[in-house]
């Protein structure tokens, strides 16, 4: 019984001590000098939080770069192995490489050995020049940091560049069809070709653009609120502009 009473007293005293400490801290917060210090600490916490956000974005960018470099290294390593394999396993039916000299001394020639005259290789026709397709440049880390916070929301640097990559995919797919000879088109490509032509206007002449139907046709992107939010960011960064007409919004690559 006595031990229970002691435990109860100890518990009550602990609660009283907690209340006293709380009241003491509350009073400290009302003092002008301490209040100024607390406000400074709060401002510094906000600055540190912004720095941490920038650091997180930089880490994501470095990870993406590191991953790309790793893939490039693996690809080059495979190419090098293939070249070494071909070098060590040259088929016997291929002609051997002969070393020719521009100047030969008359004393070095064997008068009984006929001189071999090498015929010039036939000139190959230069390949037909392919028409280049304009693509949207990726957002840089400095540009991302300059985007207003209300536009970015929870979007990251990688999210925006992933969408740019898909938009470029749609642009390239569309204009490959437009540059393709009509005789070699399939029925599906021909239908798309006619749609592309119908969607052109005077404002889009000479420019590369896509519409939402192209995004759905050539990519796996969802044309939703998040997608349109990223389009607003791309307009802010001057990566694209909009041309409206005939019930369509055309996203022109700038």
UniProtKB/Swiss-Prot annotation:
Q: What is its main location?
A: cytoplasm
State the Pfam families in the record. Answer: SKA1 (PF07160)
State the organism's lineage: Eukaryota, Metazoa, Chordata, Craniata, Vertebrata
- Residue ranges for the region (Disordered) are 105-131
**Function statement:** Component of the SKA complex, a microtubule plus end-binding complex of the outer kinetochore that stabilizes spindle microtubule-kinetochore attachments, promotes alignment of chromosomes at the mitotic spindle equator (chromosome congression) and assists suppression of the spindle assembly checkpoint. Kinetochores, consisting of a centromere-associated inner segment and a microtubule-contacting outer segment, play a crucial role in chromosome segregation by mediating the physical connection between centromeric DNA and spindle microtubules.
The protein's name in its UniProt record: SKA complex subunit 1
**Its family?**
Belongs to the SKA1 family.
Organism name: Bos taurus
Compartments annotated for it: namely:
Cytoplasm, Cytoskeleton, Spindle; Chromosome, Centromere, Kinetochore; Cytoplasm, Cytoskeleton, Microtubule organizing center, Centrosome
Q: Which residues carry this modification: Phosphoserine?
A: 241
Motif Slightly degenerated SXLP motif, residue numbers: 92-95
